[in-house]
């Protein structure tokens, strides 16, 4: 009798294991680098559910282009406008678009270095002109921060002066140029600056020079694991995920904020 009960228990365990294995999925995720530090914290926690994440990073503009041209990933994370465009173009399952977080742009310098005054647009302009080199994302790479910074320089009337001494980042944090001594100032999304050791954030871009970018996720129409993709999006709105998002310098959407 005892042997029969042991065999029965083992049978139930095997069935449960097989069911869990069947539910587990390998999710290919194409994501903006602005969420890289969030993934560093949350990917292992989501993978504890049995799913596995394969993360590929690309600027938001490049994500739209690559997916539009036929590249398939299970879940996409980009700017909200990028996800909306891909949904309208039939690349993202309608109704899966989920606002994840918003991020402003900031300024960083080498840790321990004097922090320039960036309290006003005019002070920020003077700080840029005084720097030996300024690092920001290459606008041609398709990232939101690079495109906005190009507009800021044009508005301040210093595009020529800054670009003559600029270090343009492509696929690397702009703060890495500061760490290597190749730039005095780095400008990028705040979470990306906070993710680089050896630099200190001076503060956000001043006044109306600031640009807050909302980021969203969505499930690709050709995903092999759409249910697992939806589970990932739901997880990113959980209290545990919200805490990690805030800790990495992003702002969760109002409806998702912990009370």
Which functions belong to the PLM regions below?
Residues 1-10, 19-21:
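Bacterial N-terminal signal peptides that target proteins for export
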Residues 25-72, 77-81, 85-90, 98-103, ...:
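Exported/periplasmic ABC-transporter solute-binding proteins
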């Amino acid at each position: 009798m005892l042997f029969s009960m042991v065999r029965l228990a083992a049978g139930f365990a095997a069935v449960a294991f097989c069911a869990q294995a069947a539910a587990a999925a390998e999710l290919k995720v194409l994501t903006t680098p602005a969420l890289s530090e969030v993934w560093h914290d949350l990917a292992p926690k989501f993978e504890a559910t049995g799913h596995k994440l394969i993360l590929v990073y690309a600027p938001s503009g490049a994500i739209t282009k690559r997916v539009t041209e036929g590249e398939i990933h299970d879940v996409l994370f980009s700017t909200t406008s990028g996800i909306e465009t891909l949904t309208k173009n039939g690349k993202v399952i309608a109704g899966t678009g989920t606002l994840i977080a918003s991020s402003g742009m900031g300024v960083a310098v080498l840790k321990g270095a004097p922090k320039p005054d960036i309290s006003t647009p005019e002070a920020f302009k003077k700080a840029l002109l005084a720097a030996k080199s300024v690092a920001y994302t290459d606008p041609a790479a398709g990232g939101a921060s690079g495109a906005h910074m190009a507009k800021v320089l044009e508005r301040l009337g210093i595009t020529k002066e800054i670009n003559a001494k600029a270090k343009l980042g492509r696929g690397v944090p702009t703060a890495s140029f500061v760490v290597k001594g190749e730039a005095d100032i780095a400008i990028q999304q705040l979470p990306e600056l906070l993710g680089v050791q050896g630099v200190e954030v001076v503060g956000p871009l001043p006044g109306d020079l600031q640009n807050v970018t909302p980021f969203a996720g969505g499930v690709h129409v050709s995903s092999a694991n759409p249910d697992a993709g939806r589970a990932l999006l739901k997880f990113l709105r959980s209290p545990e995920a919200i805490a990690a998002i805030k800790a990495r310098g992003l702002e969760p959407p109002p409806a998702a904020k912990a009370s």
